[in-house]
């Protein structure tokens, strides 16, 4: 009668939440990590208006809501809203009873310890899960690419990090984190579109700009040359129709926006670009393993989906590395979901089953158990 109970895999990103069942090859539910609350007083009685909306429903009613993201830079900043998102994931998206399934959650490396303790506490105390585990996002991406050695450059909506992994072990001293990711690029695009005379200010309008970014932006192989091309001809211009039917045209903004990944000074940040961060991460590793990292540089996360990003990374890292070094940038087509896919693989391995933190262990040790059991 022993029926295999599938584990749930939830990759809570700053921008999108990916959820589904271990063993599946793609997440069942992908929805924005947003909680929306009405901006105005309801006047029509019996409309069944709610005091909060989550995910796609919040997105579709965004014109009358104030949208908030409870996860900023990979760290949960509003636990009440986070609980709403998890509740929505279990009961509305996956339609499961959380008390019947082990749950695998993900988090960004170098997150505050309190963050994963609180995640653990909510899973066991609010949702009564039988078991749970918290995995590092980048490690899962490497699993998904079928490797045990490599450096993962994972860039999502809230945080970018480079994680060197050797024979399955993440090398914590060489992990670097950059708080520059998709949301900052969206904000930057809002700013440079304003310079063109289009005004985007509200939280709802930010979502429109995010869509423009996802559909039209790309990474230039040579930024200066691309700027010259854009100035001398209109070949790079594209138009976009806003929800109200107005059509806007964007030109050099298409590649100026993601260029900030390579030149954070565009955003007034003093950090290194993603290419230098990746290189610095490799240089913090033992000299003997660098060759393997250069040859296995894996891109993951939604912010690596820009056309041209892999070629540009190849060019930039080749310029930084020793001249004889073989450099290979791996950009799997499913990299938007590779963290989730890696989680699905991990949670369905027979060898992983002893790794879960059980409710019993939690009851004996409290939330701090998560630091001992999860890497």
Swiss-Prot record:
Gene Ontology terms: biological process: angiogenesis; axonogenesis; cell motility; cellular response to type II interferon; maintenance of blood-brain barrier; morphogenesis of a polarized epithelium; platelet aggregation; positive regulation of cell migration
Sites of the (Microbial infection) Isoglutamyl lysine isopeptide (Glu-Lys) (interchain with K-50) crosslink: 270
Other remarks in the entry: In vertebrates 3 main groups of actin isoforms, alpha, beta and gamma have been identified. The alpha actins are found in muscle tissues and are a major constituent of the contractile apparatus. The beta and gamma actins coexist in most cell types as components of the cytoskeleton and as mediators of internal cell motility.
Summary of subunit composition and partner proteins: Polymerization of globular actin (G-actin) leads to a structural filament (F-actin) in the form of a two-stranded helix. Each actin can bind to 4 others. Interacts with TWF1, CAPZB, cofilin and profilin.
Modified residues (Methionine (R)-sulfoxide): 44, 47
Gene3D superfamilies for the chain: 3.30.420.40, Actin, Chain A, domain 4
Gene Ontology molecular function, alphabetical: ATP binding; hydrolase activity; identical protein binding; profilin binding; protein kinase binding; structural constituent of cytoskeleton; structural constituent of postsynaptic actin cytoskeleton; ubiquitin protein ligase binding
PTM-bearing positions, type Tele-methylhistidine: 73
Pfam families documented for this protein: Actin (PF00022)
Enzyme Commission designation: 3.6.4.-
Disease listed for this protein: Deafness, autosomal dominant, 20: A form of non-syndromic sensorineural hearing loss. Sensorineural deafness results from damage to the neural receptors of the inner ear, the nerve pathways to the brain, or the area of the brain that receives sound information. Baraitser-Winter syndrome 2: A rare developmental disorder characterized by the combination of congenital ptosis, high-arched eyebrows, hypertelorism, ocular colobomata, and a brain malformation consisting of anterior-predominant lissencephaly. Other typical features include postnatal short stature and microcephaly, intellectual disability, seizures, and hearing loss.
N-acetylglutamate carried by residues: 2
Catalytic activity: ATP + H2O = ADP + phosphate + H(+)
In-chain residues carrying the UniProt-annotated modification N-acetylmethionine: 1
Phenotypic consequence of residue 70 to L: Found in a patient with isolated coloboma; decreased incorporation into F-actin; decreased interaction with cofilin; loss of interaction with TWF1, CAPZB and profilin
Subcellular location: Cytoplasm, Cytoskeleton
Predominant cellular place of this UniProt entry's protein: cytoplasm
Mutagenesis or variant effect for residue 316 to K: In DFNA20; uncertain significance
Protein name: Actin, cytoplasmic 2
């Amino acid at each position: 009668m022993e029926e295999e109970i599938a584990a749930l895999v939830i990759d809570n990103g700053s921008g999108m939440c990916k959820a589904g069942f271990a063993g599946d090859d793609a997440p069942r539910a992908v929805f924005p990590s947003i909680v929306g609350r009405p901006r105005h007083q309801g006047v029509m009685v019996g409309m069944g208006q709610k005091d909060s909306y989550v995910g796609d429903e919040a997105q579709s009613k965004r014109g009358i809501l104030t949208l908030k993201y409870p996860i900023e830079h990979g760290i949960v900043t509003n636990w009440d809203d986070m609980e709403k998102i998890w509740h929505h994931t279990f009961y509305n998206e996956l339609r499961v009873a959380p008390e019947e399934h082990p749950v695998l959650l993900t988090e960004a490396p170098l997150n505050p310890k309190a963050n994963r303790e609180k995640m653990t506490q909510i899973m066991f105390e609010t949702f009564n899960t039988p078991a749970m585990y918290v995995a590092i996002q980048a490690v899962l991406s490497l699993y998904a690419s079928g490797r045990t050695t490599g450096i993962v450059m994972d860039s999502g909506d809230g945080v970018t990090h480079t994680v060197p992994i050797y024979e399955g072990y993440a090398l914590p001293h060489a992990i670097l984190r950059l708080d520059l990711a998709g949301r900052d690029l969206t904000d930057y695009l809002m700013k440079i579109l304003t310079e063109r005379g289009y005004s985007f200010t509200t939280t709802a309008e930010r979502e429109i700009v995010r869509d423009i970014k996802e559909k039209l932006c790309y990474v230039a192989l040579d930024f200066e040359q691309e700027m010259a091309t854009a100035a001398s001809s209109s070949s790079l211009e594209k138009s976009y129709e806003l929800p109200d039917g107005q059509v806007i045209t964007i030109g050099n903004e298409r590649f100026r926006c993601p260029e900030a990944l390579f030149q954070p000074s565009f955003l007034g940040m003093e950090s290194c670009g993603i290419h230098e961060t990746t290189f610095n991460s490799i240089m913090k590793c033992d000299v003997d393993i660098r060759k393997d990292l250069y040859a296995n540089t894996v891109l993951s996360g939604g912010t690596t989906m820009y056309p041209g990003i892999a070629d540009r990374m190849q060019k930039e890292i080749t310029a930084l590395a020793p001249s004889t070094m073989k450099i290979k940038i791996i950009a799997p087509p499913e990299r938007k979901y590779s963290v989730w896919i890696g989680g699905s693989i991990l949670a369905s391995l027979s060898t992983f089953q002893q790794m879960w933190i059980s409710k019993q262990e939690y009851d004996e040790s409290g939330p701090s158990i998560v630091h001992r059991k999860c890497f």
